Amino acid sequence: MGKSPVVIGIAGGSGSGKTSVTRSIYEQFKGHSILMIQQDLYYKDQSHLPFEERLNTNYDHPLAFDNDYLIEHIQELLNYRPIEKPIYDYKLHTRSEETIPVEPKDVIILEGILVLEDKRLRDLMDMKLYVDTDADLRIIRRIMRDINERGRSIDSVIEQYVSVVRPMHNQFVEPTKRYADIIIPEGGQNHVAIDLMVTKIQTILEQNAIL
């Protein structure tokens, strides 16, 4: 084991390409000890609420996330202790009763729209990235994802974007850009920026005597 696991935070608007950047970095270090944690698995449990109330939840607001639970898990992983990662059911709009066992690794990638919003999370990170992508492209990606992966209708996705996602992005997500060590324009298509990130991460790992 090395001195301490390295935590990389990757933030950005919904549909910005965060997941693509995360996967690209993950693939570069696939032969090493690395894991990914998605912030949106840590939405608050809503099983106590009627389904109709869950439908009205603002999932783009910082209060939608159970950051206490997420921080607890990150701290466990930093101490090389295993966790039971939650599963979020997007069709039922609540946390599943099932979990995923996760073993500690030397590199932890934490990805989500608001991972840079909470100072407690930022303080756990060795590197903070913000994926910056044009709003038109982000909404197209979100429509495709929510229809294909989350069983949503196009009308509901667009209505949610206009009434919730866009204002929440402007109010909470975009401002976290100032906390980023590095801003990656054009998301997962920016291979030059991703290669630079990989080099920087390798340097941090070497300093921590992990590689």
From Swiss-Prot:
ATP binds at G12, G13, S14, G15, S16, G17, K18, T19. Keywords: ATP-binding, Cytoplasm, Kinase, Nucleotide-binding, Transferase. Coiled coil: none annotated. The keyword Lyase does not apply. Its EC number is 2.7.1.48. Pfam families: PRK. InterPro entries: P-loop_NTPase, PRK/URK, Uridine_kinase, Uridine_kinase-like. Pathway: Pyrimidine metabolism; CTP biosynthesis via salvage pathway; CTP from cytidine: step 1/3; Pyrimidine metabolism; UMP biosynthesis via salvage pathway; UMP from uridine: step 1/1. The keyword Kinase applies. It catalyses: uridine + ATP = UMP + ADP + H(+); cytidine + ATP = CMP + ADP + H(+). One of its GO terms (molecular function) is cytidine kinase activity. One of its GO terms (cellular component) is cytoplasm. Its main location: cytoplasm. GO terms for biological process: CTP salvage; UMP salvage. It is found in: Cytoplasm. HAMAP family: Uridine_kinase. Belongs to the uridine kinase family. PANTHER family: URIDINE KINASE. This is Uridine kinase. It comes from Bacillus velezensis (strain DSM 23117 / BGSC 10A6 / LMG 26770 / FZB42). The lineage of its organism: Bacteria, Bacillati, Bacillota, Bacilli, Bacillales. The gene is udk.
